[in-house]
Amino acid sequence: MARALWTLPTTLIGHLAGLVVSGGGPRRVGGPAARAWLYVIRPGLGLDWVGAVTLGHAILARPGLLDGDDLHARLTLAHELAHTRQHDWLGPLYLPLHVLAQLASAALSIGGRPVVSRVHDDNPLEQTFICIAASATRAPYPAGLASDAERRRFLARFGA
């Protein structure tokens, strides 16, 4: 109950944004480690640049990104579900901290990398060791990071 209240402000923003961009109801996703509501962004809204965004316990994602059984889709879903855990820990502090971390990450790493890479790679809230998943801008699980068995256990915990 306390966790639900702690994440409520951001989750309400996520549900409101999800209803606006999806035009319909969400579906439940996740597993034992984290659960969320998934809203699929309607095409034609000019949001094609958005991969997936997690706001509290609501995930907004472009069509097809988190569907399917391929490894990248499953790891991306698990990555977004890991953000719900970060919301559990940080509550209403998550959004301002994430925005500050994104801005600092971009400022510290200007030059040499695409913008999307800059704002994700150096942001501690996007780091693999915190999100325990794949970067949205790189191949999932670089060589040696995790064995196949570890990947399967991780995906099972997140219901992906």
What are these model-derived regions, one by one?
Residues 81-99:
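Catalytic Zn2+-binding segment of zinc metalloproteases
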Residues 11, 76, 84:
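Ser/Thr-centric signal marking residues that sit
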Residues 32-34:
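Extended acidic/polar regulatory tracts at the flanks of large eukaryotic scaffold/adaptor proteins
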Residues 1-26, 37-43, 47-48, 54, ...:
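Metalloprotease/metallohydrolase-associated module, dominated by Zn2+-dependent proteases
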Residues 46-52, 59-77, 120:
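Short pre-active-site segment immediately N-terminal to the catalytic Zn-binding motif
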